[in-house]
């Protein structure tokens, strides 16, 4: 455990950020999974709506710095490609 005040504060901040980032990533995984399930079931209307929701969450996560912007772009591209093939 750190003895320096600034490092103690940093540890607290890092723990808070870790929890927040984990929550955002969990929400992302859920959104993408729901889209994939709808796409595999062949439900085009639902899949398109869920794809838009997943893309929105990916953009938000990238803007918050939870994931890299290129990773968000790659995932959005894959979602759009899968939605277009339905």
Curated annotation (Swiss-Prot):
GO-annotated biological processes: translation
One cellular component term from this protein's GO annotations in UniProt: small ribosomal subunit
Single GO MF descriptor: small ribosomal subunit rRNA binding
SUPFAM superfamilies the UniProt entry points to: Ribosomal protein S20 (SSF46992)
Keyword Metal-binding: no
Residue span of region Disordered: 1-25
Entry keyword set: Ribonucleoprotein, Ribosomal protein, RNA-binding, rRNA-binding
Keyword RNA-binding on entry: yes
InterPro entries reported for this sequence: Ribosomal_bS20, Ribosomal_bS20_sf
Feature: compositional bias, Basic and acidic residues: 12-22
Pfam families on file: Ribosomal_S20p
Function recorded in the entry: Binds directly to 16S ribosomal RNA.
Family as reported in the entry's similarity comment: Belongs to the bacterial ribosomal protein bS20 family.
Matches recorded under HAMAP family: Ribosomal_bS20
Protein name according to UniProt: Small ribosomal subunit protein bS20
